[in-house]
A protein has these predicted regions:
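C-terminal segment of N-terminal export signals and the immediately downstream linker at the start
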Residues: 11, 21-50, 63-67, 74
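Soluble catalytic domains of enzymes that build or remodel membrane lipids, polysaccharides, and related
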Residues: 43-286
Length: 286
């Protein structure tokens, strides 16, 4: 009986080790491109079929180093996106230690630029140093701010896209600027005049933001898509019920990105793959 129990224990240990190894391997692999369609109410005709890339939770670290970052950039640029949006958690570590690992992101290319918002992890390190470094890479971080892009379709018709980014609520712990939708959209074109896209790292505040401002699409990350199959319920509890994919509230749509990278403090993915999201806009039918 003792021998049988020992064999059983060894078998369980071996299976657990195998799953852990598979999870780490999946977690650190270069993410695949996944295509999604966002159905937007009252989408301007000139933006029908407009595609952009969303990255999130890159978490450049001692685990996800320069070769991984380079692979992500190559896959994104191969899509020739019109626009690249990065919804926070760029890095883990100091600028000095991670400078080489984030360097490839300077090579991201898109006709209408590369834009981002901060995540909670930016606040754990030298926040201002990282904001300067990310901007130096050519990624314009919108902190309670917006910009207006004049987007043209292949037929030459144009429409305004109002792109906004919120500060992250983690700022409260460090006495930094909190998310402020009123400030973010101050002076912005009305939602009937421009398509408003809001970048906000944490998805759980989506209903609150919908009540405070008018926008068509919110892009978030943070949850890593649950990271392990079967953890959806636990992840949903601490994230307002949002885990990954599309959600609709009050006429607005949100996409929760499952993450392009992952945090090196828990470097395992099983059944919740990372991704490079290629999102196509289309008008929602009545």
């Amino acid at each position: 009986v003792v021998q049988k129990d020992r064999r059983t224990a060894l078998g369980i240990a071996a299976a657990a080790a195998g799953l852990a190894a598979a999870g780490v391997s999946e977690g650190v692999s270069a993410p695949e491109v996944r295509r999604h369609t966002a159905e937007i109410e009252n989408l301007p005709p000139a933006l029908e079929g407009f595609e952009f890339v969303q990255l999130s939770d890159l978490h450049a670290s001692a685990l996800l180093t320069e070769p991984w970052s380079r692979a992500v950039v190559e896959r994104v640029n191969a899509l020739r996106p019109k626009l690249i949006l990065i919804t926070g958690d760029f890095v883990d570590g100091t600028v000095e230690r991670r400078e080489r690992d984030v360097a490839p992101f300077a090579d991201l290319r898109a006709e209408y630029g590369v834009w981002g918002c901060e995540g909670n992890h930016e606040h754990y390190g030298d926040y201002e140093a990282w904001m300067r470094k990310i901007e130096a890479l050519g990624i314009r971080v919108l902190r309670n701010a917006h910009t207006v892009l004049e987007v043209k379709n292949p037929e030459g018709k144009s429409a305004q896209l109002c792109l906004a980014g919120l500060c992250d609520p983690m700022a409260a712990r460090f006495g930094r600027e909190m998310p402020n939708l009123e400030k973010t959209f101050a002076g912005a074109p009305a939602s009937r005049e421009a398509l408003r896209i809001l970048m906000a790292h944490q998805p759980k505040f989506f209903p609150k933001y919908c009540a405070q401002a008018s926008f068509a699409l919110q892009l978030s990350g943070h949850t890593h898509g649950g990271q392990i199959w079967g953890m959806d319920e636990a992840v949903a509890i601490i994230n307002g019920g949002f885990v990954r994919g599309f959600y609709r509230r009050s006429g607005a749509l949100m996409y929760v990105h499952p993450g392009t990278g992952l945090w090196n403090g828990f470097p395992i993915r099983l059944g919740a793959a990372s991704e490079i999201a290629l999102i196509r806009l289309t008008r929602k039918q009545p």
